[in-house]
Amino acid sequence: MPLPGENVTVDGNWTIIMDVDPAVCEFLTIDGSVIIPDTSDRNIECQAIWIRVGSLQAGSAATPFTHNLNIQIDGLKNDPGYVFDPSLEGNKIFVVTGTLSLYGTSPSTISANLTASAFAGNTSLTVDSASGWAIGDEIVIAPSFSSSREYERVSITNVSGNTIYFTPALQYTHYGAPSVTINNTYGILDTRASVGHITRNIKFISGPDSGWGYTLVIYSLWEGINYRAGQAILNSV
């Protein structure tokens, strides 16, 4: 096992079954194959990750990953950068020039609409479908007015059919009227606010040490005569 803070390379002839959390490394390079089995929650934490010619996989289309997987990149905005290519360098970065395949799980309903208006101060709302939504999940309610900042992110405390109870209370009003007539030419405009389910079991997480988010780059480059073309399948992530 690598020690904390080391640079780690998975060689091209290796297949690693990651059934334990690795140490917090500085730079993880994957030239071989890393498979995360669906046996328990898993955390990967580094300063930078490069899937160079290899692959990182959790789950598949037939058997999605059902546990929690957090891929966390740490670092500060002014930390020294890593050079991947003359045209690509940076810190707090995840670069894919190989293959990244992540298949998570999500409820059957990931987007719904309000069936009645929800007002500032409310701690419940009703949507047209909440299939698979559960206590502890997070949802986001789209704004109904001109300011894009009036979206709201809340945590579900209870579910009763299509009625969702949550915390904290709403700060803004969100329309649930089914439609309004604009005119005979343009017909009907649906004014119901959208409600999105945003809880996922596979997450890309920026380290808590700064407000500087990390960058996921799916990239193509030449290495000598070899052309590397990154591929990513991110399903319910």
Residues of each region from the PLM?
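Extracellular beta-helix/beta-solenoid repeat scaffolds
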Residues: 5-112, 133, 137-147, 151-152, ...
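Proteolytic processing hotspots in large secreted/extracellular or virion-associated proteins
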Residues: 114-138
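A generic structural motif
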Residues: 122-128, 157-173
